[in-house]
């Protein structure tokens, strides 16, 4: 009852005009940063961090929360309209979001993304409010062995993504893994495949790679179509409300709930992040859907799964931050700096000494999710006007944005050069009909997989010791089961096709 009283007082405090204005501004800035490739939520929070110095601790942290929520959600806008993931979390949104936009359903795709990203956020914030301490205890049980198990399980999802053409899918995934090996090895820092080039020592950054694979390759393909006169104009169908009916909303609820649980669970584990949760939710939705053949061609289920999961990661990532003082991702690491600026110490004592700030954050999270919903819905008709801009004007602008965003990631020209390299890689994937999804999944998971494997072997002295960890065993054997089942289905389909011929 005391907790509910504190939460009620926090809602009253958060809904004061000054606090609301700051949160609206924070959400709006976050959306802008999230929608521009290369300008991430981390950058937006870093920009706002010194501005909160003169505010009260509660108001300052609430403003940072607003920027965080807006930044993660904003990535869906460019992912759907331009096939450019604004943030790493919105990678999987491009798989079905942009095909829907090409089919004239841009407003429906945006509507689905906006509604279910808000719902995913609210779901995780409810979990954060009422279950944070107990979930933090579970997170402490995850050692490098368990994290390796999760990453290995995620990696085997390539077999599902490659269904229909296993050889091409596995080839695409292997190329993604190869790129993660370039640079210094995790833990010991041994240079690999750098060929004496100092720029390759740090490897390829995630955002420039994704910008190249999606945006630059799309520019090359579109330019080729313009040259051959095959370019089709994109029609934007007008819709009422968010573009979907109540019947469709009810249909998507099981997918939403499953994906939000995945997102919250992944968020609790430090270092894994929203991009992984979005991909896992997408693959799970595809595997459990009756319309799996429609995924990648403009299936609304894909958007619902991804946006529910990556926004649910926000609340999950804040659980270890608030309860243990351990940041769950890059943005919460910035927010840890916010606590220090305001003289607060994140961890168990925060709930005792500064309960008003903690419950203020809980209330601000829920209010900011609603603000994000209203702000994006208000601007939805303006967003889709991007599709009406002539391609000969739009493509150079996108190219400039891509280059600026890539440079802003680490302030090095090498990232601008790398988006061009990966743009050519993505273009070749398109020409040879290789799927980009396995490449992206393997690129995202590869480095984490190796890092947790090395840490686990250092801790337990051998890989065999991993099998003494029950949680690892569950993920490992489920992953093996997925692999065996996928190969069996592929072989059975091959035999059926051969018999029919």
Feature annotation, model-predicted:
Residues 1-60, 191-299, 384-385, 401-407, ...:
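Helix-loop-helix hairpins and the membrane-proximal interhelical loops
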Residues 41-51, 64, 79-99, 130, ...:
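Re-entrant/interfacial helical elements at transmembrane boundaries that shape
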Residues 69-74, 115-127, 179, 304-318, ...:
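Membrane-embedded alpha-helical segments of transport systems
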Residues 27-41, 71-83, 158-163, 260-272, ...:
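Transmembrane alpha-helix interface/packing and boundary motifs in multi-pass membrane proteins
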Residues 111-227, 341-495:
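Membrane-embedded alpha-helical modules
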